[in-house]
Amino acid sequence: MSLTLFDHEPQPAVWDFESRAARRGYRTIAGIDEAGRGPLAGPVVAAAVILPFGTDLPGVDDSKKLTPARRDDLFTLIQGTALAIGVGVADHKVIDRINILQATLAAMREAVECLTDPPDYLLVDGISPVPLPVAQQTIKKGDSASISIAAASIIAKVTRDRLMAEYDQLYPGYGFAEHKGYGSASHMAAIAALGPSPIHRTTFRGVREHLGESRCR
């Protein structure tokens, strides 16, 4: 079963959606979100988080609203508080092969399947349900509305940022640690100068125009 709220307006991340699911009899509720749909390089990372119901987690909100330092602090807090955390990764090759939407859903599915405590209900950021036979609700801008989704957004974002910092060491000159693969001016200039790296998404505009120019092996 999938229910989509198309007209939801953002508000501070709270327990409202989890409470509604609990009143309907669901007991193991996971929030799902991703990071990295838009970049020109690197993977898309999804996270699934099950929190102890009603736990006070001050500051947990949409990861995009938080500073990197605050995200790191909350990442540690969530890791120490959550009942279960699952992470899924779809790399640049998967993205190029099946497209970014399908890669995102595959990463979300992997994140849910990695949970040590199988959920009976999913709260999913966005409008596309996770391809699993689990009751779920998709919520536009859910990372600002559901604390479970907000927690997942932080786990996904910090995990991906750390992966991109590692790639920065493997492929110097592109600035991956700074822009995380997004199409900043400095990133576009690096692609023009160096050609695509081995982790660039070759089907994305801004990269495919430079195929065959790579100086990185």
Swiss-Prot record:
InterPro entries: RNase_HII, RNase_HII/HIII, RNase_HII/HIII_dom, RNaseH-like_sf, RNaseH_sf. It holds the Pfam family RNase_HII. It is an enzyme of class 3 (hydrolase). Keywords: Cytoplasm, Endonuclease, Hydrolase, Manganese, Metal-binding, Nuclease. Transmembrane segments: none annotated. Residues 27-216 form the RNase H type-2 domain. Its cofactor is Mn(2+); Mg(2+). GO terms for cellular component: cytoplasm; ribonuclease H2 complex. A divalent metal cation binds at residues 33-34, 125. Its EC number is 3.1.26.4. Manganese or magnesium. Binds 1 divalent metal ion per monomer in the absence of substrate. May bind a second metal ion after substrate binding. It catalyses: Endonucleolytic cleavage to 5'-phosphomonoester. GO terms for biological process: DNA replication, removal of RNA primer; mismatch repair. One of its GO terms (molecular function) is RNA-DNA hybrid ribonuclease activity. Gene3D superfamilies: Ribonuclease H-like superfamily/Ribonuclease H. It is found in: Cytoplasm. Belongs to the RNase HII family. Endonuclease that specifically degrades the RNA of RNA-DNA hybrids. This is Ribonuclease HII. It comes from Geobacter sulfurreducens (strain ATCC 51573 / DSM 12127 / PCA). The gene is rnhB.
